[in-house]
Regions:
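Short conserved segment of the HATPase_c
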Residues: 118
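M16 family metallopeptidases and their MPP-like homologs
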Residues: 3, 7-40, 46-94, 107, ...
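Short amphipathic beta-strand starts and helix->beta connectors
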Residues: 55-60, 152-161
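Non-catalytic, conformational "gating/processing" segments within enzyme and secreted inhibitor domains
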Residues: 127, 155-183
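Short, polar/flexible loop-turn hinges at active-site or ligand-entry regions and domain interfaces
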Residues: 93-101
Length: 183
């Protein structure tokens, strides 16, 4: 989907695909979120630092998020840098390298986030509400996983999830800004 808007020399990309936390195996809750968080940590062509240097040097941004049903992405750049942004998006979605050292750093960040959430009464109330309301339904499960499930996730799980759930089937991509639809 494309919409031209030449009020600014920038473009915004946004999209989603079927890879939300509903696809997490019961014993590996948080897998979808882990994969989404890992996409920008390195690809087969670029390291974590290289990706961020490319984005920073062009003033662009690119990020990923996970929901219950879908995972998504958002990016912004100058119109002239749209090919660069789309190439990085494509690399992150189709060629993530899941480097071991970066995955362990990310695992520790996720575990720290879970520990902080465990101290937040609002978070705990929401989690308890979901468990009571949805019982045995996947909606009762924590999207971010548990400390135990995050510890069980191996690099091979990340690779398998990405290969199985990421791809053009069902993906929606919108580009809005200083670009012609034909571009």
């Amino acid at each position: 989907l494309t919409r031209s808007n030449f009020n600014s020399p920038s473009v915004v990309i946004s999209g989603y695909f079927d890879a939300g936390s509903l696809f997490d195996p019961d014993e590996k809750l948080g897998l979808a979120d882990f994969v989404t968080s890992a996409l920008m940590r390195g690809t087969k062509k670029h390291s974590f630092d290289e990706i961020y240097n490319i984005l920073e040097s062009s003033g662009a941004s690119l990020g990923f998020s996970t929901g219950v049903h879908k995972s998504g992405f958002n990016g912004r750049s100058l119109a002239e840098d749209l090919p660069l942004l789309l190439n990085l998006l494509s690399e992150a979605l189709t060629q993530p390298s899941f480097p071991k050292a970066e995955m362990e750093k990310l695992r520790m960040q996720i575990l720290t986030g879970l520990a902080i959430s465990a101290e937040d009464t609002s978070e705990m109330a929401s989690e308890t509400f979901d468990k009571i309301l949805y019982k045995d339904h996947p909606y009762s499960r924590p999207d971010e996983g548990t400390p135990e499930s995050i510890q069980r996730i191996a690099r091979e799980d990340l690779v398998k999830f990405q290969r199985g759930c990421y791809g053009p089937r069902g993906m929606v991509l919108a580009v809005v800004g200083a670009v012609e639809a034909e571009d």
